[in-house]
Amino acid sequence: MYKRQLIDAAYRNGVKKLVFLGSSCIYPKMAKQPITEDELLSGYLESSNDAYAIAKIAGLRMCRAYRQQYGFNAISLMPTNLYGPNDNFDLENSHVLPAMIRKCHEGKDNVSNDIGGPYMHPIDLWGDGSPMREFLHVDDLAEAVYTCMQKYDDPEPINIGTGEDVTLKELATTIADVVGFTGGFNWDTSKPNGTPRKVLNVDKVKSLGWEPQISLKEGIASTYEWYKENEA
């Protein structure tokens, strides 16, 4: 596994400090909310992405093992859902936020080109829109990583997020407003909702002096501008 090779190579080549980026997917599906770092391994994972979560947990544990056995300074950061420029907008395998941006853009763009008017037909989205999710812009993540490199040296993981969440319905409405899509949404309840809620407790990282600076709507707007210039 590449994580093992990378962590081992960093240690053997004298890297002074290593940051391992995990994911909020490591936490149990029914973890207490907001999720604190000690919720790790306290329950069953979400079955739709448990293989991914287990791989991240393995990397986290390996960092801890190298710290204990060799004194290697490796820290583990657990970011929430990330988005921003250079995201993956492929509808076959993208995450929810960039997928919504693309669907809203293409829905508006296709009909505007055909009839020169607003799009009045809904686009399909998974689930019922009730799950709550937290989103962090990549620029805020970069600042958090830098802060932790300077100020964090503990063996335990540290959450990185905004500490605020929205329902997927609210997210879709915000994206539609930014994009200018007016057709509404068809929520396909035959598709899974996934974890009902996932928001991180970020008290630990905020105690280091870091705070997210980019609001969700502001971040969506800048991401949409990047998408139009580079992907659309």
What are these regions (language model features)?
Residues 100, 106-232:
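C-terminal substrate-binding subdomain of Rossmann-fold SDR/epimerase-dehydratase oxidoreductases
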Residues 92-96, 167:
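Short acidic-hydrophobic sequence patches enriched in Asp/Glu that either
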Residues 1:
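Active-site loops and adjacent core secondary-structure elements that bind or stabilize anionic groups
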